[in-house]
Amino acid sequence: KTKVQSKRHTIISGPPGIGKSFSTMDEIAKANINYIQFGAGSSDSAIALELAYGVSQLSAGEELVVLLDDADDVVFRDYETANKFKFAMAKDKPFYAQDVNLMTARKQYEKAGRMDLVQAIDAFTVPGKVGIHIPTDQVRFYVVCNRDCENPKEFTKKIFSAVEAIVDRTKYKRLDFEYKVAWGWLAHILDNNQPFEDYPLTEDQKRELAGWVWDKWPNMRNQSYRTIEEMAEYMINNPDGYEDEWAATFIKSSSKKAGQ
């Protein structure tokens, strides 16, 4: 059991295709912990409401894990958003603020019978302030992103000022693997999982898929586990023509032209 802890939150950063999101979700699932997840396209209002509800349900001593996947969009898309999470990850009196009038939304939720959301808004409405302010001292953030948060060239100067503060408040892990290691990680995930449980790939199919990725790696548009899942989809749905679909879908246009 951990005796002391200087930082509660974690950033896992690295290029696409090395299993960051998959492995993080796998650990969360194995731990059977209370969590919520946000990905690319999550609006500030959606994050605030779900976070408010999750925190409002916590008892003393309980913890809520919040996975911020695709954080290049969810956390680091602009200065205002990054600044919100900077305060949410502060050591002393941390909070997540949604400084938008939610009274109209509250009335709509009440009319629709969504008392869970009404109660979440009421729980964190602060007299004299607009919107809701959610204490995050019982929240543990896991941030998964592609950009190197220690490299100022990855951000505008203004955004980086907030990013620096976030990194200072987290355990930061940058994963930079050469392609052989990245491929090995993908192959390991594929070997131990089924992209589609109801239509399992055989061991031979898995080897063929992983071998194709190994051979084509430098010319592939993307090498993430999502690509592996899509390749498995073609293999299952089109057993006689999946290789042509792989080539058409996953090989860079420039590589195709060079091979002509």
Where does each model-flagged region fall?
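Conserved catalytic/switch belt of AAA+ P-loop NTPases
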Residues: Y79-T136, N146
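AAA+/P-loop NTPase substrate/partner-engagement loops
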Residues: I18, K30-L64, D73-R77
